[in-house]
Design a protein with these regions (language model features):
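ABC-fold ATPase nucleotide-binding domain signature/coupling loops
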Residues: 20-49, 53-55, 61-62, 66-69, ...
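Helical segment within the ABC ATPase nucleotide-binding domain
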Residues: 78-90, 102
Length: 146
C-alpha cells in the first residue's frame, strides 16, 4: 500500500473491519494468500478486507470518504463496523454514502438524495419532521423488521 504500519495498527484495522474471526480460522492468519489461487473470500469478506486496508491508509488523514463500504456485509457486521468507524475516527470527518437507513441515526448530519438532488438535510430527528423522509423511514423499518 505504500504506507508504513505497525502490527498493532494492522490488528486494530482487522478488528475494526470485523475480519478478526475469519483470520483466526486461517492456517497462516494474516500471512494467508488471498490473491489468485489463494483463499477464496465471499463478497462481504472482500469488502471488509478493502475496508481494513482503507482504515490503514486513512490513519493520518483528516477525512474518511466511504461509498457504500458495507453493501455486501450482513446488517449486524455492518452496524458494528460503523460503530468502530465512529469510535476510532472521532477526530476525523467521516463522509459516507449508505443505502441502509438503519445507519442514519449514527451520523451527526445527513443529506438525503433523490435523483441526484438533495431533497432533505439535517440530523436524523430533523429528517423525521420531513414528510417524505418519514414515509421512507416507515417503509424501510417495516421491510427490515426482524
Amino acid at each position: 500500500m505504500g504506507v508504513h504500519v505497525s502490527e498493532d495498527e494492522i490488528e486494530k484495522a482487522v478488528k475494526m473491519s470485523r475480519l478478526d474471526k475469519l483470520i483466526s480460522r486461517l492456517e497462516k492468519g494474516l500471512k494467508t494468500n488471498v490473491m489468485e489461487r489463494g483463499v477464496s473470500l465471499s463478497g462481504g469478506e472482500k469488502q471488509r478486507l478493502a475496508l481494513a486496508r482503507g482504515f490503514l491508509a486513512a490513519k493520518d488523514s483528516q477525512f474518511l470518504l466511504l461509498d457504500e463500504p458495507t453493501s455486501s456485509v450482513d446488517i449486524e457486521n455492518e452496524a458494528e463496523i460503523y460503530r468502530n468507524i465512529f469510535e476510532n475516527f472521532k477526530d476525523k470527518v467521516v463522509i459516507s454514502a449508505v443505502h441502509g437507513l438503519h445507519l442514519l441515526k449514527e451520523f451527526d448530519y445527513i443529506y438525503l438524495f433523490k435523483n441526484s438532488r438533495i431533497v432533505a438535510e439535517g440530523t436524523f430527528n430533523d429528517l423525521l419532521s420531513d414528510e417524505n423522509f418519514r414515509v421512507l423511514w416507515k417503509n424501510y423499518s417495516r421491510e427490515n423488521k426482524k
